[in-house]
């Protein structure tokens, strides 16, 4: 007969009708009983022949991939002009006085941040924008390209101009070595930037002065026209200098970009004055030390003999006859002036050698499940987290639930601040740019994917043998719709581009660490400036607490002004005032303790409504179920031990079948949630100890002892002794010398015992007492006559490593690999 829910509940001692604890509880450690219960609940039948269920509610497992949804009307979010002040340490010291060593160290980490992976793998530009939406390839291309352009204009990305130079918008930092600011700075840096002339090329040095003179005379116009070149050679100057060295086409460092001035062959008359008709010719040195731009008259023998000029793919359609009703020339002829082929930033800097490649792909998704109108850029830099050369990201303190409750459970009024684009506040050193490259190969290659009869014969430059091979109805309709949104920018976005991150990207494991260090240091400064208030952060989520609403408002004003003075951008529309119940990290934290937020409780209820009974569920689905239930497990009677059968099926990669009793048990557990309370400081006066054959308690002057009917593993015996001490004394602070009991993780014990002990010891705090000083040591060995001196050990609630102050442990030195010993604990859950 299957085990009923009521019988199972009585077995776990969850009802008041249970017998004496000293008799009932040791039975739950019996392996035979645990095996019989597992068989009755059908928990151990891992090998089933019935087909697995691969979907439960919104949880999907194997063979049921969710198709991403593309929104053609996504709005690209706007980014403010984010510029974190370089003298942030000085500004903080003006605000609060001298900084602590830890605050200063954390702020120095991000001024600027550095990223040097062991190995960087470069991918072709074709893989710059991932074909995440095969049905919307062109639309997704232009939307992503527009997002990248927005980031560049906001100063978040560098734009690669040549192998050794990049341009960007916004305010420069001191470590961004300026490349061009008029003739003077070019002359100062010319010795280090221009290529070393070969023997006998005195003509180059002879003409250097005239080039500089030309630059200074033409001023801004010349700098803009030739802004991405390092040496500027006027088209009228004859030259006898041979090329310094053409980089081999197979080396992977050739720039695939349509030249800017080539576009002027198809520009309107008024634009010809602005963009003179001079063909450009780009060369890379094989040594990587020099990149020069040489200008020659369009018909010169030199320019034709070296390399054919590839004009702008987009503007070529202007002078071609329409091939059909859906020819792209019809779109190109809609506008007389399509603007330049390229744009340049306000500043040009020198960068390490950067190939015309990408190191990660990008694609767009919804900003979040609640905001599908705006898009979010996903950057895949997972190459740095995989393989033999993966980077070990630094670890940082994250508060667990009990630490968070100890810190924030109070009678304060709360509000939370929203930091706009938190990651994009932290600047990266330009030396990291070659490792964090994104970009695109130009729309012509994407067009080639759509067209079945297209022939992409010239792989090196991405141009087509026949221009009109790319024309199709699908492409025409897509571009006409995009023209409504982007207008002349369609031309700009159709060109290849390589961009590197100037601020830390979200797709690298280093970024969360740096953001956590930054916000924790800022909150530490705020706490010291306002000692009667509380400021706390996790990543970009910052909360402020004060004793009254009026006090909180004045604190909010002062802190907001301070953060704005540092260059930190806040979103005032998303500032939330919580009253006395703070919503933070998925919890509701009040003076009573912590509980899960309401939307998580609703998800759990929905999950139990959808979970089928007596049907094997794919272990991938079980992973997702356990992820949801595990978040709320500390608020239930039996906690994590109740989920151990599910953990076992995931570990063995087998299906799991919910029996009616086990489902009812879990359902009741999660329908009645108990808050996790704040730990209070106090004195420990109740002690427990055990041997494999007996247990002993010390409660003030009173001593108690007992024996087990059969010898038990020492950790199990110690856990039983702690349960007896809690049950008999009612004390919520216990002293023990067992590290496993101290850890309060009961998933390593026999399943039934772990569930029962979690409920008995819920809300109990433990203090470590050495065996030599433990008053319960003698009773556990059967000696009641001896009396040790009375102990009163102080208990102080822990906040983990997340201290309210910036005094964190110093950076540890590199230790050798830790030796792993076999654990003496029993395996938590073994299927019968």
Swiss-Prot record:
EC number: 2.7.7.7, 2.7.7.49, 3.1.26.4
Chain positions covered by the region annotation Spacer: 178-335
Catalytic activity, as annotated: DNA(n) + a 2'-deoxyribonucleoside 5'-triphosphate = DNA(n+1) + diphosphate; Endonucleolytic cleavage to 5'-phosphomonoester
Protein's UniProt name: Protein P
Gene: P
Regulation: Activated by host HSP70 and HSP40 in vitro to be able to bind the epsilon loop of the pgRNA. Because deletion of the RNase H region renders the protein partly chaperone-independent, the chaperones may be needed indirectly to relieve occlusion of the RNA-binding site by this domain. Inhibited by several reverse-transcriptase inhibitors: Lamivudine, Adefovir and Entecavir.
Domain Reverse transcriptase: 346-589
Entry's free-text remark on domains: Terminal protein domain (TP) is hepadnavirus-specific. Spacer domain is highly variable and separates the TP and RT domains. Polymerase/reverse-transcriptase domain (RT) and ribonuclease H domain (RH) are similar to retrovirus reverse transcriptase/RNase H. The polymerase/reverse transcriptase (RT) and ribonuclease H (RH) domains are structured in five subdomains: finger, palm, thumb, connection and RNase H. Within the palm subdomain, the 'primer grip' region is thought to be involved in the positioning of the primer terminus for accommodating the incoming nucleotide. The RH domain stabilizes the association of RT with primer-template.
Molecular function as annotated in GO: DNA binding; DNA-directed DNA polymerase activity; metal ion binding; RNA-directed DNA polymerase activity; RNA-DNA hybrid ribonuclease activity
GO terms under biological process: DNA replication; symbiont-mediated suppression of host innate immune response
Entry's family note: Belongs to the hepadnaviridae P protein family.
Positions of region (Terminal protein domain (TP)): 1-177
Function: Multifunctional enzyme that converts the viral RNA genome into dsDNA in viral cytoplasmic capsids. This enzyme displays a DNA polymerase activity that can copy either DNA or RNA templates, and a ribonuclease H (RNase H) activity that cleaves the RNA strand of RNA-DNA heteroduplexes in a partially processive 3'- to 5'-endonucleasic mode. Neo-synthesized pregenomic RNA (pgRNA) are encapsidated together with the P protein, and reverse-transcribed inside the nucleocapsid.
Upper taxonomic lineage: Viruses, Riboviria, Pararnavirae, Artverviricota, Revtraviricetes
Other comment: Hepadnaviral virions contain probably just one P protein molecule per particle.
Annotated source species: Hepatitis B virus genotype D subtype ayw (isolate Italy/CI/1992) (HBV-D)
Keyword annotations from UniProtKB, A to Z: DNA replication, DNA-binding, DNA-directed DNA polymerase, Endonuclease, Host-virus interaction, Hydrolase, Inhibition of host innate immune response by virus, Inhibition of host RLR pathway by virus, Magnesium, Metal-binding, Multifunctional enzyme, Nuclease, Nucleotidyltransferase, RNA-directed DNA polymerase, Transferase, Viral immunoevasion
